[in-house]
């Protein structure tokens, strides 16, 4: 990895191998048995996967020195947001359904109070 010493590369590889081992220790559930038994096994498996994911995030966060809280996403002001449907409107199978979207006007135009 560029800009890192070889020692920390080996430590990162060891960390990634540990996380890989955690995920490999929880194989997908057996598809045999009654519907209820399969459902319970899948539910328990998903819970273990969530726990492994949480542990993996904590291990990597500690190793990389990142904060546990995500950085807040900076959004533009609402006045600048528009809905435009000129290209790629909708997903496949829904194109042409409903009325076309229109551009949202700024609040100053909407609040002018003049009648046309």
UniProtKB/Swiss-Prot annotation:
Pfam families: REV (PF00424). A motif (Nuclear export signal and binding to XPO1) lies at residues 73-84. Residues 36-47 have a biased composition (Basic residues). InterPro entries: REV_protein. One of its GO terms (cellular component) is host cell cytoplasm. Residues 18-26 are annotated as: Homomultimerization. It is found in: Host nucleus, Host nucleolus; Host cytoplasm. The modification Phosphoserine is found at residues 5, 8, 92, 99. One of its GO terms (biological process) is mRNA transport. The RNA-binding motif binds to the RRE, a 240 bp stem-and-loop structure present in incompletely spliced viral pre-mRNAs. This region also contains the NLS which mediates nuclear localization via KPNB1 binding and, when the N-terminal sequence is present, nucleolar targeting. These overlapping functions prevent Rev bound to RRE from undesirable return to the nucleus. When Rev binds the RRE, the NLS becomes masked while the NES remains accessible. The leucine-rich NES mediates binding to human XPO1. HIV-1 lineages are divided in three main groups, M (for Major), O (for Outlier), and N (for New, or Non-M, Non-O). The vast majority of strains found worldwide belong to the group M. Group O seems to be endemic to and largely confined to Cameroon and neighboring countries in West Central Africa, where these viruses represent a small minority of HIV-1 strains. The group N is represented by a limited number of isolates from Cameroonian persons. The group M is further subdivided in 9 clades or subtypes (A to D, F to H, J and K). This is Protein Rev. It comes from Human immunodeficiency virus type 1 group M subtype B (isolate HXB2). The gene is rev.
